[in-house]
């Protein structure tokens, strides 16, 4: 479990403001819970499951603040085969995000399944030279800073999706 509280103040002193200054204050809170388990299915085969759940909120002094609150669930399921020369892992990450706002339009819920696969092969049993390869498809939603901070936020931002390929060797 984790709790995070962050506070930011932006003071802009300029004659363009009626009072001669713009004083914005932002408060973000995050509550975070995580649980995981590992089960050995056979000699070289294991199964893991993990759940992360967090709640984020943003308050600020700007009259147009929508006061967003985001609920996020990340569920991962992974299977791994591992012997002295080969490690193969495949996983699936389920992401579910729902957001509420006190003002303005509520963003759509976001749901996504993100697969990943990785292989590592020890070429010679008496040397630690390995060939490896991996594939990952990932999804990231914009942060509250990206969406709601005055002058830099954009509520029309869409989630990012990336596909990652990696091939390499280690010794």
Predicted segments with their positions:
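Outer-membrane beta-barrel proteins, especially TonB-dependent receptors
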Residues: 1-171
């Amino acid at each position: 479990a984790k709790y995070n509280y962050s506070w930011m103040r932006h003071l802009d002193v300029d004659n363009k403001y009626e009072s001669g200054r713009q004083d914005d204050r932002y408060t973000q809170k995050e509550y975070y819970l995580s649980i995981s388990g590992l089960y050995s299915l056979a000699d070289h085969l294991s199964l893991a499951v993990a759940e992360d759940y967090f709640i984020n909120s943003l308050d600020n002094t700007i009259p147009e603040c929508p006061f967003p609150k985001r609920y996020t669930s990340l569920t991962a399921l992974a299977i791994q085969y591992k012997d002295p020369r080969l490690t193969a892992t495949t996983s699936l990450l389920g992401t579910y995000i729902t957001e509420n706002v006190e003002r303005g339009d509520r963003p759509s819920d976001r749901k996504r399944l993100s697969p990943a696969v990785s292989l590592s092969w020890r070429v010679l049993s008496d040397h630690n030279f390995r060939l490896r390869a991996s594939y990952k498809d990932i999804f990231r939603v914009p942060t509250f800073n990206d969406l709601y901070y005055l002058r830099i936020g954009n509520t029309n931002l869409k989630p990012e999706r990336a596909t990652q390929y990696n091939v390499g060797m280690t010794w």
